[in-house]
Amino acid sequence: MSCDLKLEYLLRDRPYDPAVAPADYDMLCVKSGGAELYGEILWPDGGFQGPRPCVLLCHGYPGVARNDDLAAALRRIGCGVAVMHHRGAWGSQGKYLVSNCVEDVAALAVYMRSPAFCEAYHTDPDALFLIGHSMGGSNVLQAARCTQGLRGLILLTPYD
């Protein structure tokens, strides 16, 4: 991997330094199956150097949890974190169908390894991790079967 993570900041914020750009986030919009998927990208403060690892965080069944606490912890240690929502969930376009979820995860992973994404968010295309919680764990596992270049998977209480 191209950088060192700062695990000491997993559960607490880094000390304030007015000379360092603060951590921030932006909205994302990615196409999958002809629909626009909405979400956010969170990135760490400017104290982290070099291209960063990036995580695609996939929630479980819509309406359950977005896992904001996990996204914030990963950002604090130096990861870029994308939290996206499948077609028809949390305001994304299209109709929610379980059968679309794997396609959505795969489309997001391909986009997050693209030169445009990596340049815009200073991430390493060879350090993309997928994390899935509950039904998101199953979606991540299935998407990984048809997605090249992933660094790793983390399944949290996966549901099949």
For each predicted feature, which ranges?
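N-terminal cap/lid segment of alpha/beta-hydrolase-fold proteins
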Residues: 2-49
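Short beta-strand element of the alpha/beta-hydrolase
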Residues: 50-60
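The serine-hydrolase catalytic nucleophile loop
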Residues: 60-73
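Conserved alpha/beta-hydrolase
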Residues: 75-93
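Alpha/beta-hydrolase active-site loop
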Residues: 96-122
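Alpha/beta-hydrolase fold nucleophile elbow
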Residues: 119-134
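Glycine-rich nucleophile elbow surrounding the catalytic serine of serine-hydrolase chemistry
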Residues: 132-142
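Active-site nucleophile loop of the alpha/beta-hydrolase fold
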Residues: 154-160
